Amino acid sequence: MAPSYEHLREADLDEDEFDEDEVDVSDLREKFEVQLEQGFDTFVVIDGLPEVTEEQKPKLVKFLLKKLTSVGKTKEDMIDMPMGPDGKSLRFAFVEYSSPGEAAAAVRQLDRVPLDKKHTLRVNKLMDVDRFGREGRIDDEYQPPHIDEFHPRDHLRSFMADPSGRGRDQFVMFRGDHVGVFWNNEKDTPENIVDRPNWTESFVQWSPLGTYLLSMHMQGVQLWGGPKWDRLGRFPHPFVNMAAFSPQENYLVTWSNRPISIPDEGHPALSMDDDGKNYVIWDIATGKPLRSFANLDLPPDDPNKPPRKHPWPAFKWSSDDKYVARLTQGQSISVYELPRMNLLDKTTIKVEGVQDFEWAPSRPQRDGVKTYEQMFCYWTPEIGSNPAKVGLMSIPSKEVVRSLNLFSVSDVKLHWQSEGAYLCVKVDRHSKSKKSQATTLEIFRVKEKGVPVEVVDTIKDTVINFAWEPKGDRFLIITTVTPTGEVAVQPKTAISFFCPEKSKGSTVGNFKHLRTLDKRNSNAIYWSPKGRFVVVATVHNQNSSDLDFFDLDFEGEKPEGEKDLTANLQLMNTADHYGITDVEWDPSGRFVATWASAWKHTMENGYHMYDFKGEQLREEAVEKFKQLQWRPRPPTLLAKEEQKQIRKNLREYSRVFEQEDAERIAGADQEVVDNRRRILEDWYEWRESVDVEVDEESAAMGVSSNPAEELLKAKTAEILASGQEEEQVIEEIVEEVLEESEEIVS
């Protein structure tokens, strides 16, 4: 029965005995408290200041002002430093900024910043001090903070020590709902290390040095690693879509197409400053967010082109993690310093019309430059009568060290060589009538004095792919003829190889065309991470799935016309993998994995494994196979001299490795033989035990253990007694000549 007033006692209805003060509603008041605008959101409180007298106070204020103005606008008269009754400062100050955003930036960028060797700033919002420091929220008695017991962490680079001693590499596979990490066993079944269902909700990703495995979830991103595959970090970003590491694994960027919405009860990691943002940059070591950003407005769509998407990655890193930059297309490039995430020199780099930029993948060591620098390249289109331009900018000086004017430009792509020694600018040019198009390759020699630019032959066809040799100076392009209209069959492609001429001394010669292989369907280039070997493939194509394995340092005879070039090209092998969508080399450059992903199609999903020569080692069809990714290796710890010594003695090491491989294979074969022999011996023992049991049962029943033998003896005796001859079996063998041939051997 539902309660009603009739069920209440008279005493319960006596209003005189009801006292409102006895009802504690503090929890409800705190939960549903409305934050009224009090006008203090532009103020911050700075603790940790040195104690000064009234005479010393102006000097401290001026010194402090230099740091305060690095994040926003404030003045001396907007800094209030209270003094005690003894005439000395109380070691804190109130600072007013011109906007709430600047106050938030001060908290984010100046908190824990050293003022000098003995003093470190602690910066908080005045509103936060009032909110968290009000009566009842702080205990009168000091309670020491709880410090968790220290537990040593497993070595995060343990994967470098292969327990078999064979130097195998690991890879991760995502199939169905399962994610597993495996040791590569060449022709044999991969050795499973860990396999977990529902480990990720969308995809997995290795960090650049192989330390972490990233998994994606609706609530955010998680990192895993170590020999026990423990969770090493959580980065809560609701509805996250993408994530990317910095090159040295110090930072992580997460992005969601949905703006962050901070609930009234707060968020475990994000603050109200992050509300409405799409990108978050995290410090991996602490798990704390450094700064968040909103999506930039996209330029208006061209009605003749598909809708624009937000660029990814939107934040690009310098090779040493000291800087991260973001492009505002058509306007500027913003460079931020890590870990404070403050804008370099407090200003963006204004570049009118800028379309794209790329950091050098390694620290460039330009000739004659001894100071520290990082470098990025950028390009701008033709604007009015001004030509298109490609520029190289040094950071942190922001000096443009080289620029190049370009004319009749349709599009530009920027391609850095892995060590930052070369930059290839692929320029698509149009004729005056804009009816025909050609491509030129402008190569910047970054490490040479003055950064000279070399123009490679003009290419009449459209270049659809370009790739530098890692740690080398050779490159490939794939070209095709652009069809004038819709065609039923895609036009054929051509593969062109380029390399430098031989030259005296340490200088690299001019780049020359080595060879072109036409009438192909190839559309993708995959260099070995060690250089020399390259796979040219046809991916995402229903009609073709070719794989061509090339060696650019073939040790055989070199064609006469190529003897002055630094390459000897040889096609080692060809293969075919139907439905292929992806190709990836292992970090050692010994093996190549290809796979057909269920994310692209559902036909014959699975993977193939090849060696660097193109010999297929393994093929496995896997239902709902989605992803395979090799685990990267960190750079070697060996000095250059030690590496040279190893290369010098490589033949001796090879003999040892070949002997170990032969013994391992022989051992595996012997193990199979021993196992079969053991099974056969077990069967013989079982049969013998059965015979013994039958004999014992027959003796107990008074029956012969072999009645067939007894019957045969009785029948033979009966035949002999009747005078008949013993039965005999006669076999007749007939041979027939089917074909006869005669061969004369000289």
From Swiss-Prot:
Signal peptide region: none
Swiss-Prot/TrEMBL WD repeat ranges: 195-234, 247-294, 307-346, 349-386, 458-500, 517-560, 575-620
InterPro entries: EIF3B, eIF3B_RRM, Nucleotide-bd_a/b_plait_sf, RBD_domain_sf, RRM_dom, TIF_beta_prop-like, WD40/YVTN_repeat-like_dom_sf
General function of this protein: RNA-binding component of the eukaryotic translation initiation factor 3 (eIF-3) complex, which is involved in protein synthesis of a specialized repertoire of mRNAs and, together with other initiation factors, stimulates binding of mRNA and methionyl-tRNAi to the 40S ribosome. The eIF-3 complex specifically targets and initiates translation of a subset of mRNAs involved in cell proliferation.
Protein's UniProt name: Eukaryotic translation initiation factor 3 subunit B
Cell compartment(s), UniProt: Cytoplasm
Source domain of life: Eukaryota
